């Protein structure tokens, strides 16, 4: 069956995961003749022999802060029991502490439960991913940061103890949080239970944020995941916002205030690349809510996963096939440079300004290019990836967006996704290396980071470059 488990780490990541599984729910509504994918790859089926029905739950593990699950969250003293939902007898001898008002169920969820017409979704009624989630997750899917609370004003950075004094905003905070408080519990508990439901596990999707403590948290999780399951494929997906190195950022000059943000981003990226088979750096555009960002990025996320789960076995690919198609066997070139549909590039890499001695944009070397055609073909010839071929063609069924995806991101249902690995990635690592040289004065891993960034920059080099100057003076 070759199941794929999705590990979603952060509020923003959970929005993308929700949109993806809402699409999976839509496939279940298709008739047997209309089926285009194998639902069991991403969904766990449970047969009720009494009612003779089958229910499906996502093969997913979601991490969030307290109250980040919205109406699905718990507001009680014990994390493992829910005082509000029929367990009152278990709490007779305990003191229940309520730290905040209960979050009401969304109108969309209430309508789903009642079988009533569904309301239109908008920026205001999609604050939480659970506001519009269609599938019912198993109890072992939920993982909560015990000491960090969801902040509705800043949903991507949890607040420590809900005090408004400390944010989940550093790589080191997230890394230590997982290794010190959750590593053993997660791997022996919920992850183990999820893996027991798989017959032949193919791999994982790991979705996270790169600029906050979630980047460190997911990095620590990923390191241990690789140690535990070294032969399973991992595709990592990281959300990246604009920074002083991107072309749309208003600042023309770097300042030290960017140290923690860029530090988070570069450390998280290095870890994702080292521990993943492929890393997809998603661009999170300013002005979009998490619901909108997820609706936009889901076109990419779903396209990759549709390729490995489609019911057409002649066209279906494996995660290993996709990895080879993009890297051509060069494991250090596993960050996807371009994710293009039409005129839109969904990758953060395309936003980065050229480094001072980079080649001109129209002469950037392309190491590999792959196409995923989401048309309505019944059969197409496809090429096999090898070190001599730079262009790979793949085919899958058309896009079936859920009605929870914003209209502006769901109109085009037949398109071609272009995946590219190019010299452009060098710009990112050269910028970051220069940043480390100038700002990381007392960091214990300064030299290690410089070497790693230089190695990655070299991996994406092609041809000759003019000499460059780099010093330790502040910008």
Curated annotation (Swiss-Prot):
In the UniProt record, does the keyword Mitochondrion occur?
yes
Q: Which family does it belong to?
A: Belongs to the misato family.
- Annotated GO CC locations: cytoplasm; mitochondrion
Chief location category: cytoplasm
Q: Which GO terms describe its biological process?
A: mitochondrial genome maintenance; mitochondrion organization; plasmid maintenance
A single Pfam family it belongs to is: Misat_Tub_SegII
Name of the featured protein: Protein DML1
């Amino acid at each position: 069956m070759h199941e794929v488990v999705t590990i979603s780490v952060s509020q923003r990541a959970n929005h993308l995961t929700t949109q993806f599984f809402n699409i999976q729910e839509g496939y279940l509504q298709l008739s047997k003749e209309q089926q285009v994918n194998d639902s069991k790859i991403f969904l766990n089926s449970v047969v009720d022999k009494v009612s003779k029905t089958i229910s499906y739950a996502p093969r997913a593990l979601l991490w969030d802060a307290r109250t980040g699950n919205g109406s699905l969250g718990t507001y009680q003293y014990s994390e493992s029991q829910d005082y509000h939902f029929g367990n009152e007898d278990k709490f007779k001898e305990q003191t229940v502490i309520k730290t905040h008002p209960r979050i009401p169920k969304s109108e969309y969820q209430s309508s789903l439960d009642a079988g009533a017409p569904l309301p239109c979704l908008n920026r205001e009624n999609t604050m939480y991913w659970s506001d519009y989630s269609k599938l019912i997750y198993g109890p072992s899917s939920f993982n909560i940061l015990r000491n960090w609370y969801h902040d509705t004003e800043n949903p991507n950075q949890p607040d420590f103890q809900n005090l408004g004094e400390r944010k989940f905003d550093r790589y080191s905070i997230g890394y230590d949080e997982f290794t010190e408080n959750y590593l053993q519990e997660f791997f022996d508990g919920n992850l183990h239970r999820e893996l027991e439901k798989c017959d032949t596990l193919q791999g994982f999707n790991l979705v996270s944020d790169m600029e906050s403590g979630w980047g460190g948290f997911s990095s620590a999780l990923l390191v241990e995941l690789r140690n535990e399951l070294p032969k399973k494929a991992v595709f990592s997906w990281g959300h990246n916002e604009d920074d002083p190195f991107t072309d749309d950022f208003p600042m023309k000059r770097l300042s030290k205030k960017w140290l923690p943000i860029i530090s988070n981003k570069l450390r998280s990226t290095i870890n994702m690349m080292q521990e993943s088979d492929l890393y997809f750096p998603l661009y999170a555009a300013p002005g979009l809510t998490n619901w909108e960002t997820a609706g936009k990025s889901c076109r990419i996320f779903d396209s990759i996963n549709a390729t490995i789960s489609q019911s057409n076995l002649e066209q279906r690919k494996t995660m290993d096939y996709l990895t080879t198609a993009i890297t051509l066997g060069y494991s250090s070139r596993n960050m996807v440079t371009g994710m293009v549909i039409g005129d839109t590039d969904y990758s953060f890499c395309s936003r980065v300004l050229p480094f001072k001695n980079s080649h001109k944009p129209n002469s950037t070397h392309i190491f590999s290019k792959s196409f995923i055609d989401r048309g309505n073909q019944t059969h197409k010839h496809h090429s096999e990836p090898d070190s001599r071929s730079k262009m790979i063609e793949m085919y899958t069924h058309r896009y079936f967006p859920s009605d929870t995806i914003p209209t502006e991101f769901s109109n085009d249902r037949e398109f071609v996704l272009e995946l590219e690995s190019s010299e452009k990635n060098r710009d990112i690592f050269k910028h970051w290396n220069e940043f480390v040289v100038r700002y990381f004065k007392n960091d214990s891993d300064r030299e290690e980071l410089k070497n790693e960034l230089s190695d990655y920059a070299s991996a994406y080099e092609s041809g000759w470059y003019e000499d460059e100057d780099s010093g330790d003076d502040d910008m």
